[in-house]
């Protein structure tokens, strides 16, 4: 069985929920404190043993490439000024993994974005990490899925429970059997209508997929939002070859919409020793 050493991070979206900030700035580069959100995702992949990462980008995304590239002039200035801590942070972001880029030429959905990286992946199993979800966990969320893949040899989809009122916002699984945190899946449903979801186990932006998924994506018809939906292709693959779901452990932060982004920023700031005391005092002064 081939080891999981490659990952895809889709980052071609327009980021319309954060306009006008994302008119010229990639949404993935918006920072949680002093680190862009996409770096948290790359760090998770690297901690999970991923060596090669392909980031699927689009127009106006050059800042992502610049961030993970070395900047010798900046490094020299920091070194000359004795700012060793900042220098270490800057260099760290360039050394996480081997990072490559491919452009999604049309905005045709997540499934289409994954297809854009087919040549990079070849005939290997691979991970997918979506940038809207930062997961804090002792064992990286995607590593938990990799462990299930190495045990079963089958594709694995990361899920977590959500309130029933929110199920229409996610891809949802209809579980068949349960073994601890692992599920066999009867079917996958992309954004079911309110009140029709088969469970409250939602797909949460972490996948380990076998290369056969590309064959299903190639023939996948447009689905929700008139886009090529990855969930729809996974559902078809599941009909031929069992796909598992795994309820991964960890605290998930939704940074794909404004309120979640603000909540995440506040929570991370409260974890920072240099900010906690003053921020706590400020929040109390608001008298909310």
Swiss-Prot record:
Gene Ontology biological-process entries = enterobacterial common antigen biosynthetic process; UDP-alpha-D-glucose metabolic process
Highest rank taxon of the organism: Bacteria
**Keywords of this entry:** Carbohydrate metabolism, Nucleotidyltransferase, Transferase
One family from Pfam that matches here is: NTP_transferase
Instruction: State the pathway, as annotated in the record.
Output: Glycolipid metabolism; diglucosyl-diacylglycerol biosynthesis
Q: Name one GO molecular function term.
A: UTP:glucose-1-phosphate uridylyltransferase activity
Record's catalysed reaction(s): alpha-D-glucose 1-phosphate + UTP + H(+) = UDP-alpha-D-glucose + diphosphate
Please indicate if the UniProt record lists Amino-acid biosynthesis as a keyword: no
What is the stated purpose of this protein?
Catalyzes the formation of UDP-glucose from glucose-1-phosphate and UTP. This is an intermediate step in the biosynthesis of diglucosyl-diacylglycerol (Glc2-DAG), i.e. the predominant glycolipid found in the S.aureus membrane, which is also used as a membrane anchor for lipoteichoic acid (LTA).
What is the protein named? Answer: UTP--glucose-1-phosphate uridylyltransferase
Naturally occurring in which organism (per UniProt)? Staphylococcus aureus (strain MSSA476)
